[in-house]
C-alpha cells in the first residue's frame, strides 16, 4: 500500500450519519448485522441514528493455508438477510463481501469506504478510496503528543 487515508472519529460519525439518512425510513429494517470487527463501530453508529435495537454480528476470519487466503465463518446471524442491513467499514478486494452476499443474499449490504475492486459488491457506500490506499481507522490509532518542530 503506497498511500494512507486517516479517518478521525468525527469523519466516521459524519459518514455514518450520511449512510443512515439514505436508509430512511428506519421502520423498513428488521435490524443490523455488523461484520466483525470492522463493521462493529459503524454498526453501533447506524443503530443509534436509525433507532434500531436488533443488532447481530457475523464473524469472519481470514487465514493463510498453502499460500491461499481462505475465509472461515466463526459466527453467523441466522436467516437470509431479508429486511436487514449488513454493514462493514470497508469493501476492499471483495473476498469478504462475496462471502457475505452468499450468506445474506436478501440483505442490504453497505460500507463506509469502498475501493474499486469491491465497489460492485455493495449496495451503498459513502467514500471512494483508491485501491492502493491503506485506511487507518480511529479505533486502530491512539492520540499522542507531538512535539513542535522547533523543539521549543
Swiss-Prot record:
Recorded hits in Pfam families, A to Z, give: Pribosyltran (PF00156)
Q: Which residues bind GMP?
A: 69, 92-96, 134-135
EC numbers listed for it are: 2.4.2.-, 2.4.2.22
Where is this protein found?
Answer: Cell inner membrane
* InterPro entries linked to this entry: PRibTrfase_dom (IPR000836), PRTase-like (IPR029057), Xanthine_Guanine_PRibTrfase (IPR023747)
Question: What's the cofactor?
Answer: Mg(2+)
**Signal sequence bounds:** none
Name of protein: Xanthine-guanine phosphoribosyltransferase
* High-level lineage: Bacteria, Pseudomonadati, Pseudomonadota, Gammaproteobacteria, Enterobacterales
Amino acid at each position: 500500500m503506497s498511500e494512507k487515508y486517516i479517518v478521525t472519529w468525527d469523519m466516521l460519525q459524519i459518514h455514518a450519519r450520511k449512510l443512515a439518512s439514505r436508509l430512511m425510513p428506519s421502520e423498513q429494517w428488521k435490524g443490523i448485522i455488523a461484520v466483525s470487527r470492522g463493521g462493529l463501530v459503524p454498526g453501533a453508529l447506524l443503530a443509534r441514528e436509525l433507532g434500531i435495537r436488533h443488532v447481530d454480528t457475523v464473524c469472519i476470519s481470514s487465514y493463510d493455508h498453502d499460500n491461499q487466503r481462505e475465509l472461515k465463518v466463526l459466527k453467523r446471524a441466522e436467516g437470509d438477510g431479508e429486511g436487514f442491513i449488513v454493514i462493514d467499514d470497508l469493501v476492499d478486494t471483495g473476498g469478504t463481501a462475496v462471502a457475505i452476499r452468499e450468506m445474506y443474499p436478501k440483505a442490504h449490504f453497505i460500507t463506509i469506504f469502498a475501493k474499486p475492486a469491491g465497489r460492485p459488491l455493495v449496495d451503498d457506500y459513502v467514500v471512494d478510496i483508491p485501491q492502493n490506499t491503506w485506511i487507518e481507522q480511529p479505533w486502530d490509532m491512539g492520540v499522542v503528543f507531538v512535539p513542535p518542530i522547533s523543539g521549543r
